[in-house]
């Protein structure tokens, strides 16, 4: 049974122009977010008529984004309206009386680091890709964000094996966390029983790894370009953990090494609404096409659109 048969969606949406030039939308089976976005879209068109809109316009945003229906009878698609919804409010001051570790570290951060931490906490709600250049202090920002959310539950830090003890020192020395609350996992059978648990990428996909059986509140991935291959075992293991986490922070100085498809797995784990299916993502942003040797997703297309989407929805980069 097809998706459209399972969910009956309206083919006609009535649009009324009010006296004060406001737009009111009437459509069955539309949630409030879709109505608000559609009203904002039509507000700019100022067309006083009844629109015949395809079913795709009432579907979830990921369906919209991947159907290549970016305009219909002069109406911009809902995805493009996100730029009017995002980054419009000023960041509020922090209320961190109950977070002494975070408050202490916050005062020691540089201005650009404070700005990055504030964006990820207040704007991205703890789910973002921190892609600052090398030397700008991504580790300090990552520790600060981990301290802010530490009371929500266990935190898992995944990094290359040579950075495990670097993260241990960062949490204890920079973050002021007691050493008994930080665990560097050296064996697959070792259970992540501490508040902060650190494991390497190589150990994560092993069958007997206890980390895969544990639920975490926050996931931090340092050098996240290690999960660029969506078919690799480490990436699949990471996706399994990310589904259960409320906060996800990816950190890398090179978010995409060569091709846009290498961004898919990170975008899918952080916020899958715009990167739910790899084939749709490849068709839109990687010039995906079928060849004699199979499906080719090594190209690139709609570069400006992808760059805008990353800056507005996923990434902090200075």
Regions found by a protein language model. Give the residues of each.
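Conserved helix/coil segment N-terminal to the catalytic DExD/H
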Residues: 188-218, 229
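Conserved pre-motif I regulatory segment
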Residues: 90-131
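Conserved helix-turn-beta segment of the N-terminal RecA-like "Helicase ATP-binding" lobe
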Residues: 163-186, 270-274
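Walker B catalytic acidic pair
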Residues: 222-223
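Accessory DNA-engaging acidic/polar modules
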Residues: 1-104
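Conserved P-loop NTPase motor "coupling/switch" region that bridges the ATPase
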Residues: 151-154, 218, 235-318
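Walker A/P-loop
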Residues: 125-145
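Conserved Walker A/P-loop ATP-binding site and its immediately adjacent core
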Residues: 139-141, 152-173, 257-262
